[in-house]
Amino acid sequence: MRELNDVYDVVVVGAGPGGSMASYASAKNGAKTLLIEKSQEIGEPVRCAEAIPSIEEFGLKPEPEFVRNIIKGGILFSPSGKKVTVTQDKAQGYVVERKIFDKYLAIRAAKAGAKVAVKTTAIGLERDGDYWNVIVEFLGEEYVIKTKVVIAADGVESNIAEYAGLKAKKKPLEICSCAEYEMTNVELLDKNMMEFYFGNEVAPGGYVWIFPKGETANVGLGVRDKKKKAIEYLEEFIENGLAKDRLKDATPIEFKVGGAPVSGPIEKTYTDGLLVVGDAAGQISPLTGGGIYLAMDCGLIAGEVASKAIKLNDWSEETLKEYERRWKEKHYEYLMSHLKYRKILEKMSDDELDALAEALGESLDGIDLKKFVKRIITKKPSLLKYFKDLL
């Protein structure tokens, strides 16, 4: 492949939303950029529930090509079935077709000037003076790609950051195991509302979701548990869970599995000539497991910082630390607060989760975690022990 026999300013490893946005920003700002993806097709395999709160700020329009549904809120269910409806006046987000959306973002990067190499796996990384040698495998052959800056957007199983000496590996229980069916004939409560089901029996350390997707719906869950596999919990929910009557005629048309790192961001996301983005960097909500938007925004910042470093002819750690400063200014507080809330929810019994739902009430306008906490403590003082440090 001719793209592998060249020298680049920036090589991005991983063509998920974060990697494609990094490639787009890098190429748009004049850096000679290569985006490599280990799969033979960008967007495959799909590994997530496919919800994203916003795309307009990235200069994207919600094209019918990839948007499957507009989301206006969510319905939360406690273990016993107590319901809390969260709504907003304006559209809260979208459910996208990831296999199309990811490809759309990669095409956008290519149109900005980035080269793309698929079925190309990064198997090593070596320092070569001021450059990196990215060792890749394509169709059984090894290639060495020389580059000034590497952007590691290679997902939860990231090796690139580790090759560069950054600590990115996650322990098993720091990863939420996910399983999901895309199903048809699902009876929805509301075609524009996502559904979430909580409980230590139904999804320990996580939750079940039902996301409307036009003619179909994503029915899945994430768990942090050693007792059973995620798919076993999912099958039990479909057969015996709170939504069983609405799922009795549902049938799967696609099955997806994956993992979401929910332990918060890694300690350091930059070093000489290298930046880490998205799931690889732990830039994903520890509470919801949502990471598409965060990966895109952090990827955009990484691409801008990398291309700026090329123009300065200085891609040292000192120059690249701007990336971590910028993404932390926007997202670090959000991530760490979600980590605190996740740890609180994990300590609660099912009875306490029911009490929590009762305290929140049947409906909420918008999501404001601080207001949630005040309402909870006022209505259910017994839960103060969990939330007192957040006041």
Swiss-Prot record:
Reduction reaction proceeds via syn addition of hydrogen for double bonds. Keywords: FAD, Flavoprotein, Lipid biosynthesis, Lipid metabolism, Oxidoreductase, Phospholipid biosynthesis, Phospholipid metabolism. SUPFAM superfamilies: FAD/NAD(P)-binding domain. FAD binds at residues 18, 37, 48-49, 51, 98, 122, 279, 291-292. PANTHER family: DIGERANYLGERANYLGLYCEROPHOSPHOLIPID REDUCTASE, GERANYLGERANYL DIPHOSPHATE REDUCTASE. One of its GO terms (cellular component) is membrane. GO terms for biological process: glycerophospholipid biosynthetic process; membrane lipid biosynthetic process. One of its GO terms (molecular function) is oxidoreductase activity, acting on the CH-CH group of donors, NAD or NADP as acceptor. It comes from the Archaea. It catalyses: a 2,3-bis-O-phytanyl-sn-glycerol 1-phospholipid + 8 A = a 2,3-bis-O-(geranylgeranyl)-sn-glycerol 1-phospholipid + 8 AH2; 2,3-bis-O-(phytanyl)-sn-glycerol 1-phosphate + 8 A = 2,3-bis-O-(geranylgeranyl)-sn-glycerol 1-phosphate + 8 AH2; CDP-2,3-bis-O-(geranylgeranyl)-sn-glycerol + 8 AH2 = CDP-2,3-bis-O-(phytanyl)-sn-glycerol + 8 A; archaetidylserine + 8 AH2 = 2,3-bis-O-phytanyl-sn-glycero-3-phospho-L-serine + 8 A. Pathway: Membrane lipid metabolism; glycerophospholipid metabolism. Is involved in the reduction of 2,3-digeranylgeranylglycerophospholipids (unsaturated archaeols) into 2,3-diphytanylglycerophospholipids (saturated archaeols) in the biosynthesis of archaeal membrane lipids. Catalyzes the formation of archaetidic acid (2,3-di-O-phytanyl-sn-glyceryl phosphate) from 2,3-di-O-geranylgeranylglyceryl phosphate (DGGGP) via the hydrogenation of each double bond of the isoprenoid chains. Its cofactor is FAD. NCBIfam families: GG-red-SF. The lineage of its organism: Archaea, Methanobacteriati, Methanobacteriota, Methanomada group, Methanococci. This is Digeranylgeranylglycerophospholipid reductase. InterPro entries: DGGGPL_reductase, FAD/NAD-bd_sf, Geranylgeranyl_Rdtase_fam, Geranylgeranyl_reductase, GGR_cat. Its EC number is 1.3.-.-. Binds 1 FAD per subunit.
